């Protein structure tokens, strides 16, 4: 009981001690003598005017300069976010922060991550639960830092899940249809309009997933080309990404029987030659021969495997829908609303929890392995400035 009564004081003491520890650790990094103190560190470039205002209050000498390329591995990274991308910090930090000379992946990943999550979950009821949980948590708990990013990600995932559920006609599976059957409503009561049904249109959903995968992967390649051009590696962009694009166009033309000369798919042949040459540019002697086979194998199996990975979007959408309908059907067997809602609550709580985690893990895999593999340079370390960092209390400047 005594500990419970002193909980507020203990929390305040914990915040005070953690702040003092951070300050002491920072002081250990200072260089100085009796009358001189020397400090060196990193700061975001846009914060320089604020730094100038602070230093101008004191009689001290200071200067700032951009880091030299040789210093890039040591420069900390601070991601720039908005309300849409802040939740993706959770994903990026779980994988690895970008290198200083890399690109911020959050704005490039956000549309795809949110879209894919909604497609895999695809249920209006589950989406509403996620939205409500996120809004209540942000309103009542006032989360900060990691908890806040989780709530923001949950909110965007819930919005996407609701929209995709509206397109597939899912509201806790077919719960309304089963309730209508128990109440003796006419056949078809409770059936929601939909653009497509994952159970009836599984092939179309699978093809659509593959197309989204192609768009996703090619977006990553475009980002990599932009980075190559900025670095002056135009040849690399032509012989790697460019060669693959020519090959893709050649495959499409070959299937459509367009552009063949004397029965030979010219564009496809040119693309294949470019891929082979690009893969063997750096090899010498006998290594060129082995590189040819390695390039063919890696290109064919790599791209086939990458695109096939996106079939998980269809698989998770289908699995979640089927499990939801199974629990609804079991609950409706007794033809009693009380029994139905008991089984409904237990079954959907289990299905919701499994899908909430499963969709996140599989979406994470598509972003980190497939998408990031096309352009992402990781290895950055987080920018950690000296500041009052509390866990239980907010600080107010007076």
Predicted stretch roles:
Residues 1-83:
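Intrinsically disordered, flexible peripheral segments
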Residues 49-398:
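Conserved, carboxylate-rich catalytic/transport cores that coordinate ions
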């Amino acid at each position: 009981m005594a500990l419970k009564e002193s909980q507020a004081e203990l929390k305040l003491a914990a915040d005070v001690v953690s702040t003092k520890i951070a300050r002491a650790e920072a002081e250990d990094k200072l260089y100085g003598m009796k009358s001189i103190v020397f400090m060196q560190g990193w700061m975001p470039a846009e914060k320089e005017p604020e730094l100038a205002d602070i230093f101008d209050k004191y009689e001290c000498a200071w200067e700032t300069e951009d880091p030299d390329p040789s210093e890039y591995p040591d420069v900390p990274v601070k991601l720039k976010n908005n309300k849409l991308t802040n939740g993706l910090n959770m994903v990026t930090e779980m994988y690895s922060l970008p290198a200083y000379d890399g690109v911020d992946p959050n704005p490039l990943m956000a549309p795809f991550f949110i879209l894919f999550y909604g497609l895999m979950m695809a249920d209006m009821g589950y989406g509403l639960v996620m939205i409500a949980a996120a809004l209540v948590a942000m309103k009542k708990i006032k989360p900060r830092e990691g908890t806040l990013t989780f709530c923001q990600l949950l909110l965007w995932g819930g919005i996407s899940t609701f929209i995709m559920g509206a397109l597939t006609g899912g509201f806790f599976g077919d719960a309304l249809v089963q309730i209508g059957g128990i109440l003796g409503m006419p056949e078809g009561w409770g059936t929601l309009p939909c653009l497509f049904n994952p159970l009836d249109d599984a092939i179309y959903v699978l093809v659509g997933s593959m197309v989204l995968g192609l768009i996703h992967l090619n977006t990553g390649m475009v980002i990599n080309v932009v980075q190559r051009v900025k670095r002056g590696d135009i040849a690399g962009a032509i012989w790697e990404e460019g060669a693959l694009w020519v090959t893709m166009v050649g495959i499409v033309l070959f299937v459509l029987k367009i552009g063949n000369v004397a029965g030979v798919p010219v564009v496809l042949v040119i693309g294949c030659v470019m891929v082979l040459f690009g893969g063997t540019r750096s090899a010498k002697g006998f290594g060129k021969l082995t590189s040819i086979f390695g390039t063919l194998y890696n290109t064919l199996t790599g791209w086939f495997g990458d695109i096939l990975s996106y079939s998980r979007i269809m698989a998770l959408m289908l699995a979640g829908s089927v499990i939801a309908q199974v629990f609804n059907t079991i609950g409706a067997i007794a033809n009693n609303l009380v029994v139905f809602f008991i089984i409904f609550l237990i079954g959907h709580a289990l299905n919701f929890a499994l899908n909430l985690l499963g969709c996140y893990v599989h979406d994470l895999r598509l972003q980190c392995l497939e998408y990031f593999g096309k352009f992402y340079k990781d290895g950055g370390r987080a920018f950690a400035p000296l500041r009052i960092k509390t866990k239980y209390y907010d600080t107010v400047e007076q």
